[in-house]
């Protein structure tokens, strides 16, 4: 269906809030399957029967870690060998059920799981409902239907649990595109992707919090250092602020990814240290601005992997080829945390100090107003000239050499 458009995440959340079933698909390079999803509070016999009739897959009950602990739902196996590490617990039935398999009795079990008064002794195992424990952090940590189900229930203001069921085609194989799209249209069912849900959360969830503010005298001048911590990962970042950023005027700003070798060791294999110095100097001269120092070593692959990439570069690969050879994308960085840091600092619009078009696009996607790009001008040396040319040719970096 070439003219098909996925639903808005807001519409999917509202449908979940109203007790409806929606369709959610994951990535093509993962399961590439669609699941029916609804909230556990609306695990009615009708919804379960619909999933069993049209989905024909295993009806599971994704739950938060808190619910699993409260009800003492233990992992199904000691060693999880599932291809995607789906976190099955022991299967359960509520003690008020008979066989537990009918749509009506599975409804009882699912709804009792989210009952405020539920306790571990209310359930027996094995049973006919299959709880799955969602990762803390949801789809931003694991892009599975388990996490999507719990995230959607939470975003809808409901208990952090739901139902999900894989969808099989009439021939018994898993239904994929475009048949999933056709089904959604025929049943007037909201249909979103997990990627959409990830993007929605990055834009709307509060994913970073400010911890402290302290004076930071530097060789460039005096700045204020604002410390931040990511809510999900605990990763720490710093904003170096000069002057008042909250007056509504556009702010000279830079996102600088941590580079221990360039920033601290003075390595000439990259231009990171020079870019940091140039940005600090320019902001000091202007008397107002901010540098976000993000812990994204090696374009997001980490220090050790960056050094491993250097080894491959010494054997003839370029910086992009080396990252890919190690199993990474050419650039693993994302900028939604940086965008939220800008927002918490009161920054409304920026003149972005960068040569990297991906930073511009990444911040714009988060709704940040970038009024201009200010180039970072550094002189290449014999050790980094080839590296910079590769970034220019393969990654679109905007250099003037």
Curated annotation (Swiss-Prot):
The lineage of its organism: Bacteria, Pseudomonadati, Pseudomonadota, Gammaproteobacteria, Pasteurellales. Zn(2+) binds at residues 259, 270, 272. The active site is at residues 331, 333. Its EC number is 4.1.99.12, 3.5.4.25. This is Riboflavin biosynthesis protein RibBA. One of its GO terms (biological process) is riboflavin biosynthetic process. In the N-terminal section; belongs to the DHBP synthase family. In the C-terminal section; belongs to the GTP cyclohydrolase II family. InterPro entries: DHBP_synth_RibB-like_a/b_dom, DHBP_synthase_RibB, GTP_cyclohydro_II, RibA, RibA-like_sf, Riboflavin_synth_RibBA. Residues 204-401 are annotated as: GTP cyclohydrolase II. GO terms for molecular function: 3,4-dihydroxy-2-butanone-4-phosphate synthase activity; GTP binding; GTP cyclohydrolase II activity; magnesium ion binding; manganese ion binding; zinc ion binding. It comes from the Bacteria. GTP binds at residues 254-258, 275, 297-299, 319, 354, 359. One of its GO terms (cellular component) is cytosol. The record marks 128, 166 as: Essential for DHBP synthase activity. Catalyzes the conversion of D-ribulose 5-phosphate to formate and 3,4-dihydroxy-2-butanone 4-phosphate.
